[in-house]
């Protein structure tokens, strides 16, 4: 209240910033006549002078902004026949300053982006424009290409089906690169899994503009980018677990919490499951896989809905993006959940995967020197943008005032009554020819409406995840006279819905929302499809107490209001009090999701520091100039000191107390080198360390002396990389499992995040040692045929090369399965877990206490 009052008196921060931007815009406008008078060649020459002044170090990008924007606007007018409005110039300045420009639908964000893109491309370090799908990346990149090329810049577009690293590298080396968030992120991960510099495609992270920034940095931030490969988990029991899950009774055998998305087995449920599985203890080590798979089967059946969370498409379970309604082809749920869904739907159960490399969008985009974004809906998440990304949100006024009418919500008691009212409204509007766009929250609801409209013989088009390939055309035509369009979660963002004068006379595009989304931004995006660039239009939401949001989060208060007002069946209430109650429920969910995203980024920040260290060293290994032999010599000395510590030989100790027999037995076991303790009995610690290190080095040098230096270096480099990748993969497993269980420490009055940081530091120290020492051990024991060592070395190098090429091509890693001689024998905490996850028992099913189905999203 006080803040709002102060804003009215002194003006808000947003108002003050807009005032500053308008002063810069005036300077740009003052140059318009100057550049308009120039010929094309003279305009290009003027721009080249600006480029030279920046590249020579004489001027900064900020100092040439006014001239660059003025020239870009003039070039756009000539080449694209599109002139930037003043508000678009403001948007461009906001983006250049590394902020978020909130601009309403239809305000021309694609054209706005050209201003900061051109300015920042001058540096020669590359500019990335990120969009939500290939269609928009290709459309925007190619539509703006003539402008960029007129000003002397090269343009590239990264597409999902682009696999050739040579072609991709050329695209990334362009001055300006358009692409999707997924492709940029996955290319970064693939680069850091590559075994040669030739297969790496990205060249750095200078400046990025994220289109639909709220969708990418907020909505998709809960889902990390993951590259995965196969595990050795058996696929048996998924079908049996599904059958058993269906036999268990809700509330008696397990409880479901939709709000927190958890399924918990009760004591009765555990007993019943043991009877059905015919085992004595569901949580004993030998049954570890059964308890895990049953948990996933329960989630699949009671938390995940077909045509809401996923669809079955051509015999495959495909995830539906909850924010866009699009199919997420290629993505799979982890931890066996996808297999559980496949068992539920009776389709082929595919092999489970393990994480090979991952990164969150938060940490990927924070790598850029400068990050900016644009969207029509950002203010509701302004605090999150500021706290996580250090991004300010600037709301930019529309070029023409908005004439759209946003009517109050209509709330019915039941979903049936609500849909009857929606159909009546559609029939009424359709009869007049006024176009209607109906927004639904799921594929299931869009199919219900589709069937009813078919019965009513009302011509219409459906846009959901099942036909998203045509979304651009469907959305584009949604403003035509008489058009009735059903769209799930407002897929088709980035495509304008234009209306002609005849439609404007009928009242413009009418938006009908059939359900409030958990997030207000999604609702605002739906509203924003109508009334673009000063067009008229109307929006209204039809709700019921049976809607997911109201049922889970807010229906009690609203229900009591309806009862007090005496609302009869078929009647609705239209009240600001109720609308506020709905928004309060939405804020509750938004806050819950924000805490989830904050939780993810806090934990991933820990992993991210480790990731940066590992990837930095990995890139050093790939550098042909990196002296790998010197590095091997360094870690060999560390390895010998490590062996000393293992047998309690320490600096300052008495040499007579050195247990050389134990030391040399360990050396023989680890690197197959025979040594006589009597030959070393007279050495003090430092001498012993130096002599033994030299002895091990001499043994290695003698073996490798038959090879030329380049082959030696190649083998050392390939083996080091292989050990690094293998250890990093297992480290990701350990970190992921530790993160899952660390929350329990809160019960012991300990901060889980602090504990996670401590534990992860210890794990990382172990990781670094494992990589170094395993590399030394492998290099020491590797042998070549005596007849032709050069040929054998080439064969080894070629084998390594083939393996890494397979890794790069299919992201598949060799894995070995070991059968336990006796499944019921006692399992050591450091043994591999019998559930087949590939993790140590102590980090998987051996964690204290039975797992009872806590949902892992």
UniProtKB/Swiss-Prot annotation:
It is a peripheral membrane protein. It is found in: Cell inner membrane; Cytoplasm. It holds the Pfam family SecA_SW. Its EC number is 7.4.2.8. Its main location: membrane. It catalyses: ATP + H2O + cellular proteinSide 1 = ADP + phosphate + cellular proteinSide 2. This is Protein translocase subunit SecA.
């Amino acid at each position: 209240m006080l803040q709002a009052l102060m804003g009215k008196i002194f003006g808000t921060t947003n108002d003050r910033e807009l005032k500053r931007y308008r002063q810069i815009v005036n300077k740009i406008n003052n140059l318009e006549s100057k550049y308009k008078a120039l010929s094309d060649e003279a305009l290009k020459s003027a721009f080249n002078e600006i480029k030279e002044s920046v590249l020579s170090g004489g001027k900064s990008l900020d100092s040439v902004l006014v001239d660059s924007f003025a020239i870009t606007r003039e070039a756009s007018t000539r080449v694209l026949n599109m002139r930037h409005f003043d508000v678009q110039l403001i948007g461009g300045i906001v983006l250049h300053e590394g902020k978020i420009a909130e601009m309403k639908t239809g305000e021309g964000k694609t054209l706005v982006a050209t201003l900061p893109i051109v300015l920042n491309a001058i540096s020669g370090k590359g500019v990335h424009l990120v969009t939500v799908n290939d269609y928009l990346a290709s459309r925007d990149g190619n539509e703006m290409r003539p402008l960029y090329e007129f000003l002397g810049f090269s343009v590239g577009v990264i597409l999902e089906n682009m696999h050739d690293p040579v072609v991709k590298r050329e695209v990334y080396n362009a001055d300006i690169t358009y692409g999707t968030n997924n492709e940029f992120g996955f290319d970064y991960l693939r680069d850091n899994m590559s075994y040669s510099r030739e297969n790496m495609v990205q060249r750095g992270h200078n400046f990025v503009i994220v289109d639909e920034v709220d969708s990418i940095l907020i909505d998709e931030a809960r889902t990390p980018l993951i590259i995965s490969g196969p595990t050795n988990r058996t696929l048996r029991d998924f079908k049996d677990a599904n059958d058993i899950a269906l036999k268990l009774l809700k509330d008696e055998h397990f409880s479901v919490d939709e709000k927190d998305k958890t399924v918990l087995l009760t004591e009765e449920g555990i007993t019943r499951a043991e009877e059905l599985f015919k085992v004595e203890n569901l949580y004993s080590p030998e049954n570890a896989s059964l308890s895990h798979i049953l948990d996933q089967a329960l989630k699949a059946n009671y938390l995940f809905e077909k045509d809401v969370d996923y669809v079955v498409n051509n015999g495959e379970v495909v995830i539906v993006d909850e924010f866009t309604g699009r199919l997420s082809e290629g993505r799979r749920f982890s931890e066996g959940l996808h297999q559980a869904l496949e068992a539920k739907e009776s389709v082929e159960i595919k092999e489970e995967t393990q994480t090979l490399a991952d990164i969150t969008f938060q940490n990927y985009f924070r790598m850029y020197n400068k990050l900016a974004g644009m969207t029509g809906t950002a203010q509701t998440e302004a605090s999150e943008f500021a706290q996580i990304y250090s991004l300010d949100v600037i709301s930019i006024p529309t070029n023409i005032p908005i004439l759209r009418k946003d009517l109050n919500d209509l709330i019915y008691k039941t979903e049936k009554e609500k849909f009857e009212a929606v159909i009546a409204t559609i029939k009424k509007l359709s009869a007049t020819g006024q176009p209607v766009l109906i927004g639904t929250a799921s594929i299931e609801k869009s199919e219900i409406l589709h069937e009813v409209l078919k019965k009513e013989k009302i011509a219409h088009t459906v846009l959901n995840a099942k036909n998203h390939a045509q979304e651009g055309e469907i959305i584009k035509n949604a403003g035509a006279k008489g058009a009735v369009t059903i769209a799930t979660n407002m897929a088709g963002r980035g495509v304008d819905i234009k209306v002609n004068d005849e439609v404007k006379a009928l009242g413009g595009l009418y938006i009908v929302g059939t359900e409030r989304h958990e997030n207000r931004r999604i609702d605002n995006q739906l509203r924003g499809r109508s009334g673009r660039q000063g067009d008229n239009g109307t929006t209204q939401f039809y709700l019921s107490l049976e809607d997911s949001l109201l049922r889970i989060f807010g229906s009690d208060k609203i229900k009591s209001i309806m009862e007090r007002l005496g609302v009869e069946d078929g009647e609705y209430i239209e009240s600001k009090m109720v609308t506020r109650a709905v928004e309060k429920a939405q804020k509750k969910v938004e806050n819950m999701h924000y805490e989830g995203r904050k939780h993810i980024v806090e934990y991933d920040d820990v992993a991210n520091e480790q990731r940066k260290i590992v990837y930095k060293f990995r890139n050093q290994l790939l550098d042909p100039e990196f002296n790998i032999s010197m590095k091997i010599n360094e870690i060999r000395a560390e390895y010998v000191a490590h062996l000393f510590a293992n047998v309690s030989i320490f600096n300052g100790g008495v040499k007579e107390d050195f247990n050389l027999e134990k030391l040399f037995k360990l050396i023989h076991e680890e690197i197959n080198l025979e040594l006589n303790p009597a030959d070393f009995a007279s050495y003090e610690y430092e001498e012993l360390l130096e002599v033994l290190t030299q002895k091990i080095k001499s043994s290695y040098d003698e073996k490798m002396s038959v090879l030329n230096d380049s082959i030696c270096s190649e083998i050392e480099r390939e083996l080091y990389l292989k050990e690094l990748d293998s250890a990093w993969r297992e480290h990701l497993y350990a970190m992921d499992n530790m993160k899952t269980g660390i929350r329990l420490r809160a019960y012991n009055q300990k901060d889980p995040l602090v504990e996670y940081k401590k534990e992860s530091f210890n794990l990382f120290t172990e990781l670094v040692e494992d990589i170094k020492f395993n590399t030394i051990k492998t290099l020491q024991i590797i042998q070549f045929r005596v007849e032709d060592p050069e040929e054998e070395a080439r064969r080894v190098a070629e084998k390594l090369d083939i393996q890494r090429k397979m890794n790069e091509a299919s992201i598949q890693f060799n894995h070995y399965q070991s059968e336990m001689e006796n499944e019921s024998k006692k399992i050591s905490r450091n043994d591999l877990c019998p559930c087949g996850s590939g993790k140590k028992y102590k980090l998987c099913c051996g964690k204290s206490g039975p797992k009872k189905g806590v949902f892992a999203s």
